[in-house]
Amino acid sequence: MTLEHSPPGRSTGPAPPVQRRRDADLPQIDLPTAPQPAPAFERQFFACLAAQGRVRLVLDEGDSLAGRVEGVDDDGAPLWSQDLAEVAAAIPCFTAGTSIMTAAGPVPVEDLRPGDRIITRDAGAQPLLWSGQRDFCWRALGLLPMLRPVRVSPGVLGPGLPARDMLLSPNHLLLAERPATADSPAEEMFLPARDLLGQPGIDVAPLTEVRYLHLLLDRHHAILSEGCWSESLRPDPAAMVGLTEASRSALAGAGFGMDPAPSCRAIAGPRAA
């Protein structure tokens, strides 16, 4: 596997131990037991992609999620087609300024470089293989406000969780714990940030522009962002749709994004498919 990247970064010493405080480091949330319908913002997101060219959205009915996404050439001829429900996971990523825990300590996500060792929940420190980004300007956010990130205020997920305002793309997955019941034990699960909207201290950030950043490790991992466990990039075909053409080409050349990529935890919501 080869990816073009900058020289390895600052992580050289041994990784700090990862604390597994199951009763304290995960938000306790009553998670749904089955995948939930994808909300309308995903349909409108793909309309935004279509407006930028090379991807076209075809809806069966006006406001319905039924439809497909088509890749097109410069003349508008279709090259491929995929059911809209299958690509509902597009753009799961961090925003610039988010602090990511590495073996050398917390680092802003935009300052991470391939070779930096990222602290993971299950496998200690793992090297960053690739990072990418996608920008949305005021025009895109004005026409499609559902592209704006979800803002999680300090402490709303538990003591010190997150440590400060954390902004994530709506589909970015956060690790939570379903409390034990009489019929089942406690279970760690991912859920999209947008599913937390409406809870106190969680809203849509009123930004006029945003830069989304992606972090690729050897596989899908739970990593620490602002003290909360959330996901690294899961490079499956659905997520690849949300990347820039240059990013898709770079990852495809290294063998990523062509086949389904397993999640490191069960997922509550549309991305469970």
Q: What is each residue range found by the language model?
A:
Residues E110-R117:
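Structural motif
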Residues P108, P127, P192-A193, R265-G269:
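Short, solvent-exposed coil/turn linker segments
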Residues P78-P108:
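Long, positively charged leader/targeting segments at protein N-termini
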Residues T2-A90, A205-A273:
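Sequence-level preference for short, compositionally simple segments enriched
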